[in-house]
Amino acid sequence: MSLARKKFSEFKERDDHIADTELDDFWATLQPATIDGMIGEWKGGEFLTGHKMNGQLEKAGWFGKTFKSASDVQPLVCVDATGNKFSNVAMGKGEASLWLEDFRGEVTATMVYDGQPVHDHFKKIDDDAVMGIMNGKGVLDSGRYYYFYLERV
């Protein structure tokens, strides 16, 4: 198991709040994600930091994200009461696309929502997991980002 995977597993298992600085330090050790590396279906989860978004996606039945191509992304794949997955375009105000964007001095794969000013930046933990930082007007919490992860299905 790589050091990145080990640290990621430790963060996932924590049930107390994780300081943004701990996640920022981990982020700095990871390699930028590529658009090709993001293609596929991913199950999502969040890091508990005390951000206003913590718990909101779970309440909506969020499963994860599906990247069919750079121009065809389902950012909010949710599960309904009968267990069926669907793209929640109402909550996401549309769907999304993937771009390469500069974030914190590195160019990395970034998902840009079609209908709202939100950008999800990704860095690679390994071939089957990425860390995400959600950034944008609608999501910043007193200047704080929302931290999450995706694991390949």
Residue map of PLM features:
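Short beta-strand segments that buttress and anchor functional surface loops
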Residues: 44, 109-115, 132-137
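Amphipathic/hydrophobic helical signal segments and adjacent flexible N-terminal regions
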Residues: 1-97, 153
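Contiguous, well-ordered beta-strand patches that form the walls/edges
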Residues: 72-119, 123-128
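Edge beta-strand at a domain terminus
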Residues: 136-153
